[in-house]
Structures are given as structure tokens and as C-alpha cells.
């Protein structure tokens, strides 16, 4: 059955199978160097070995080798890759097979093994021509006669012995026979060839079973395949030549279109990268991360911080109302503007301002000097700080980065935005209003200045109506030595000095009627001013003297909270 090993058979069974098989088995047993072989005979001379019938020994060895090779090939064809027994157990093929007559061995041959005799004969009697022929044929016989490597459970010594025996037998037989080219150069077809086994190799009936098992193992070893060994030093092995090249598949039109699109994208990306590289060549290379070396003399770049998103908040501290772009800025503002004490004083004699931080003091100290290191590249105007230059540059560029989130008002400076944001919260910031036009102001003094500038007639009329009117011609307008007022008569204005109108002409003084309407004005420049004692002066001043009306602010009635400042004071 396939896959099963054949058990060794006894000598009696071998005799029953046939005499020719026993003869082949005996021939192979005679050639095998066993462990129980007879010891070698004493050394003989070369002439005695030649006279012992070298030609017959050569024929015997050649016949044995041919029989073994024939049986091995036949079994390979019938049962591929199976464990098979020795060729001695199978009968020879062909009905006309006649074994050759066996020659009785001589006494000298019984003393020495046939293998040693063949070796000695070849070494002594071989011609130079035969040696050259054997050397040329040797590479071809190796592929036929080399035995296969043993498995792990078989002995390696037996494998080497069988290889040596087969190679020596084929050499000796080919040197004596004329069929050298047929055996070595071409491999015969097993189905068309008949092999003859000589009769001289018939084994006697007394072969032990142990010897038969050893012979069977040797034949199995010779028939097995050589296992693969990966030798890294083998330069002739080229695995890429053994592989079958896959057939190229036909590419569809879609694949070509996708490839064309990819090529276009790659070309566009390459062009963009080239443009970026050209732009970056002008710029300085980016600084590498890590610690700064001691020998690095390049200027230190400021640390970049990401700006937080804009979230306008207002400072709720009393009297502040500053608008900031993020709650984090608000915390910083409250800490350094309201909680931290001002301990840095400006050393300038005419200043004396206080600051919370030293850098604020250093920035302020530049204003007391005439040093202007920051120059505008558009108009060549110089500034004392880089911040002032940056704000000024926005005038040329038209940039207004700050914007009111309520009405969209844009400006360049944060102070302008803070001033603008107060308009949207008029109830808290503009608590003082004009009672004539209703305009609101942040300070009370701004209302008084507004009335004196925008509504002077109404202010004078209200003042004279409340005071019943009086003509002032005193030179002491500051009230340091006030003259007593005389009572009015017949609804006319009363002079402060005796005979004030005697030497005065029409149009040189102010005369008010009882209704509070003026008839004429004194010559000179009219003005309304607040004196030191809280009185109001309305009149004209000249180099010769000053004339006008002096009124108490307590008699103004509804406008008692209004304080009138000099018209030179700044207003909105």
C-alpha cells in the first residue's frame, strides 16, 4: 500500500521469490563494506594483482552497478517518493533474461574485498588517456550516481560509504567497457530498456536477516531526495529567476485619468513650493528649538503668545470704566491699576508723578528729554516711543484696528475707544446736563463752560432778572474792596460811585431796564467771569479801567448749582 513501509523478508522467502533476485542481492552484498568484513590480506605486489584477472573483476563491478541503477530507476517510476526495499527482492524484468555464468572466486579474492581490488587495479593499470576521459565524464556522473542525503534517524557513515562505492564502481566499469557515452551523457528511458543481471551475483541461501536490513536501508538512503539547505555563500542561486513573472493587467481608462489628475496636482504643488521657497529665501531661517548656546550671539526673539479671542469687558471699579478686550486683561488691569500702590516717583523737579511699575517710570522719563529715536518712514516725523510711532503710522496706512462692538465706531487708539464707550452708558458717565439745550456732560464745570460759551445772553438775562439789575463802574472787579450798592430809582440802573454817569457818554456803559433787557453796552470787550468771592462779573475791561455788573451767585435761583468758569477753559 502507498505510505506503508515494507517489512524485511527472511532468506527462505527470498529463495522462493526467485534465483535471479537472489543473485542480484548477493552481488550488492559482496560490494557492500560491512562491519563484519574479513581483515585485509597482506600487501601484494602490482604484478600479482594484474595476473589475477582484472578484466573479470571490472566486468563484475560494472554489472553490479548497472543492475542496482536499473532497479532504482524502475522503482522510482512505479512508486514515486515511497519507501522501497532493495532491488534484490524484485525479480528481473523480461522473459528472456539469462544470467551470466558465475565464476568461482579465487582464494585471493576471498581475502580481499572487490572494492579494494578495483581501486588498486585502477590506480596501477589506468592509462593516461583513460584518466583524462574519466575526468571529463566525472561532472556528468555525479548527477546520476550521487546518493541522497540521509534522514535524521539513519547513519551518516553508511551514506558516505555507499556514495564512495557507487562512484568507484562506475569509474572502474566505464574504464573497461565501451558504453561510456550512453550511461553518462544520456539518461535512458526506463520503459524501453531491459537490464541483465549476471549469474555470478546470485547470493547463497545462507544470508542473515540483519545483513538484509542493512542493505535495504542503504538502498533507501541512496534513493531519497537531497533536502534543501540555505547556503548564504552560494552565489549561483538566483531565486528571482525561478519565479514566474505575473502577466501585466490591462489598465482601464479611469486609472489613466486618475494618474493624470495626480500628476497635475503634483506639478501644481511643486510650483507652489518653489514660490514659497523663493519667498522664504529673503526671510531669516526659523530658529531651532532648544536651549540657547553660550556662543550664540544672535539677538533673542521675543516669545510669541497667542492672542485670546476678543471679549470686551469693562472695569467696574469706582470712577474707572476702562474697557478691556478680554477678562484676563481685566484681572491684570485691576491688580496693577487699582490694587497696587504707586511707589515709583518721577525724579523730574516739575513733575513728581507716581507709577506702580518701574517700567512705567522709565517710559515716562523719556518725555522729559528731547531724545526721539523713532522716525516715521512716510513723513520723517520723530517720536519718543515705538508705540507712538505705531499709532502715527496708522494715519498713513488708514488702518483703524479698534472697533466699537455696539455701533461699529472705529479708531486707532484705545483711549479713543474708551472715551467713545462712555456715550453708550450716558446715565452712569454723563450725570450733568445743560438746562437750556439738554446736553449732558461728565463734569459740572463742563456745564458752566458750555453755558458761558453757547448761551451767554440767556445767562446774563437770568442773572440780572434775579438781581433786579445794577450798573457797575467800579475798578475793583475782584471784590477785594467791594462798594456798597445803592438802591435803584425809577427802575433805572444805579451807579456804584457818585456821579458815575456824569462824565460818561452813551454806549460807554451797560444800562439795564427793570425787565432785564439791556439798552446799551459799555465800550470795550465784554466778558463774564467768576470772581474769588463767588460773585459774577459781567462787563468790559480796558487799559483805563473796568466797568460792568457784579452779581452774587446766590440770587440766581434755578441755576444756583451752575458755576461759570473763564471762557478760556477747555470744553468738549
Swiss-Prot record:
GO terms for cellular component: nucleolus; nucleoplasm. Residues 340-370 are annotated as: Interaction with MAP3K14/NIK. The modification Phosphoserine is found at residues 86, 106. Residues 61-70, 143-162 have a biased composition (Low complexity). It comes from the Eukaryota. Residues 1-308 are annotated as: Disordered. Found in all the examined tissues including brain, heart, kidney, lung, liver, spleen, thymus, skeletal muscle, ovary and testis. Keywords: Metal-binding, Nucleus, Phosphoprotein, Repeat, Transferase, Ubl conjugation pathway, Zinc, Zinc-finger. One of its GO terms (molecular function) is zinc ion binding. It is found in: Nucleus. It catalyses: S-ubiquitinyl-[E2 ubiquitin-conjugating enzyme]-L-cysteine + [acceptor protein]-L-lysine = [E2 ubiquitin-conjugating enzyme]-L-cysteine + N(6)-ubiquitinyl-[acceptor protein]-L-lysine. A zinc finger (C2H2-type) spans 313-338, 344-368, 374-396, 402-424, 432-455. Residues 1-12, 122-131, 226-247, 254-271 have a biased composition (Basic and acidic residues). It is an enzyme of class 2 (transferase). Residues 72-85 have a biased composition (Basic residues). Its main location: nucleus. Its EC number is 2.3.2.27. GO terms for biological process: activation of NF-kappaB-inducing kinase activity; protein K63-linked ubiquitination. Pfam families: zf-C2H2. Pathway: Protein modification; protein ubiquitination. Residues 209-225, 272-284 have a biased composition (Acidic residues). In contrast to other E3 ubiquitin-protein ligase, does not contain any domain (RING-type zinc finger or HECT domain) known to mediate E3 ligase activity. Belongs to the krueppel C2H2-type zinc-finger protein family. Atypical E3 ubiquitin-protein ligase that mediates 'Lys-63'-linked ubiquitination of MAP3K14/NIK, leading to stabilize and activate MAP3K14/NIK. It thereby acts as an activator of the non-canonical NF-kappa-B2/NFKB2 pathway. May also play an important role in cell proliferation and/or anti-apoptosis. Interacts with MAP3K14/NIK. This is E3 ubiquitin-protein ligase ZFP91. It comes from Mus musculus. The gene is Zfp91.
Amino acid at each position: 500500500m502507498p505510505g506503508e513501509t515494507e517489512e524485511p523478508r527472511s532468506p527462505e522467502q527470498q529463495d522462493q521469490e526467485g534465483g535471479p533476485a537472489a543473485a542480484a542481492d548477493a552481488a550488492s552484498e559482496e560490494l557492500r563494506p560491512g562491519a563484519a568484513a574479513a581483515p585485509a590480506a597482506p600487501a601484494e605486489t602490482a604484478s600479482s594483482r594484474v595476473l589475477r584477472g582484472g578484466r573479470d573483476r571490472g566486468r563484475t563491478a560494472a554489472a553490479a552497478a548497472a543492475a542496482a541503477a536499473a532497479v532504482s530507476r524502475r522503482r522510482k517510476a512505479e512508486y514515486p517518493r515511497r519507501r522501497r526495499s532493495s532491488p534484490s527482492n524484485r525479480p528481473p524484468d523480461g522473459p528472456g533474461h539469462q544470467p551470466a555464468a558465475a565464476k568461482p572466486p579465487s582464494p585471493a579474492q576471498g581475502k580481499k574485498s572487490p572494492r579494494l581490488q578495483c581501486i588498486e587495479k585502477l590506480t596501477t593499470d589506468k592509462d593516461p588517456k583513460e584518466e583524462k576521459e574519466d575526468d571529463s565524464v566525472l561532472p556528468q556522473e555525479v548527477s546520476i550516481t550521487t546518493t541522497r542525503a540521509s534522514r535524521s534517524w539513519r547513519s551518516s557513515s553508511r551514506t558516505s560509504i555507499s556514495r564512495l562505492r557507487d562512484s568507484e564502481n562506475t569509474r572502474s566499469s566505464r574504464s573497461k567497457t565501451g558504453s561510456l557515452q550512453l550511461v553518462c551523457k544520456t539518461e535512458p528511458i526506463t520503459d524501453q530498456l531491459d537490464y541483465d543481471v549476471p549469474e555470478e551475483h546470485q547470493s547463497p541461501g545462507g544470508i542473515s536477516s540483519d545483513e538484509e536490513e542493512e542493505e535495504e536501508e542503504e538502498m533507501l538512503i541512496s534513493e531519497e531526495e537531497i533536502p534543501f539547505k540555505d547556503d548564504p555563500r552560494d552565489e549561483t542561486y538566483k531565486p528571482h529567476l525561478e519565479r514566474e513573472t505575473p502577466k501585466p493587467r490591462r489598465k482601464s481608462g479611469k486609472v489613466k485619468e486618475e494618474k493624470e489628475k495626480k500628476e497635475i496636482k503634483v506639478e501644481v504643488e511643486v510650483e507652489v513650493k518653489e514660490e514659497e521657497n523663493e519667498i522664504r529665501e529673503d526671510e531669516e531661517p526659523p530658529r531651532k528649538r532648544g536651549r540657547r548656546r553660550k556662543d550664540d550671539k544672535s539677538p533673542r526673539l521675543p516669545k510669541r503668545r497667542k492672542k485670546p479671542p476678543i471679549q470686551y469687558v469693562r472695569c467696574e471699579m469706582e470712577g474707572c470704566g476702562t474697557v478691556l478686550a478680554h477678562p484676563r486683561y481685566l484681572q491684570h488691569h485691576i491688580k496693577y491699576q487699582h490694587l497696587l500702590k504707586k511707589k515709583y516717583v518721577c525724579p523730574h523737579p516739575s513733575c513728581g508723578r507716581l507709577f506702580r511699575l518701574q517700567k512705567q517710570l522709565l517710559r515716562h522719563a523719556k518725555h522729559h528729554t528731547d531724545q526721539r529715536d523713532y522716525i516715521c518712514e512716510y513723513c520723517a516725523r520723530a517720536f519718543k516711543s515705538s508705540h507712538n510711532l505705531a499709532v502715527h503710522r496708522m494715519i498713513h496706512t488708514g488702518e483703524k484696528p479698534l472697533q466699537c462692538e455696539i455701533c461699529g465706531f472705529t479708531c486707532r487708539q484705545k483711549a479713543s475707544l474708551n472715551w467713545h464707550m462712555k456715550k453708550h452708558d450716558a446715565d452712569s458717565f454723563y450725570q450733568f446736563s445743560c438746562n437750556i439745550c439738554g446736553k449732558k456732560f461728565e463734569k459740572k464745570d463742563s456745564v458752566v463752560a458750555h453755558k458761558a460759551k453757547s448761551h451767554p445772553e440767556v445767562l446774563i438775562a437770568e442773572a440780572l432778572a434775579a438781581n433786579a439789575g445794577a450798573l457797575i463802574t467800579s475798578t475793583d472787579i475782584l471784590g477785594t474792596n467791594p462798594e456798597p450798592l445803592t438802591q435803584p430809582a425809577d427802575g433805572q440802573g444805579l451807579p456804584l460811585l457818585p456821579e458815575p454817569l456824569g462824565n460818561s457818554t452813551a454806549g460807554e456803559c451797560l444800562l439795564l431796564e427793570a425787565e432785564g433787557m439791556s439798552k446799551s453796552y459799555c465800550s470795550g470787550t465784554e466778558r463774564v467771569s467768576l470772581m474769588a468771592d463767588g460773585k459774577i462779573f459781567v462787563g468790559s475791561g480796558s487799559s483805563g479801567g473796568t466797568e460792568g455788573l457784579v452779581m452774587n451767585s446766590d440770587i440766581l435761583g434755578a441755576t444756583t448749582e451752575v458755576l461759570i468758569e473763564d471762557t478760556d477753559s477747555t470744553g468738549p
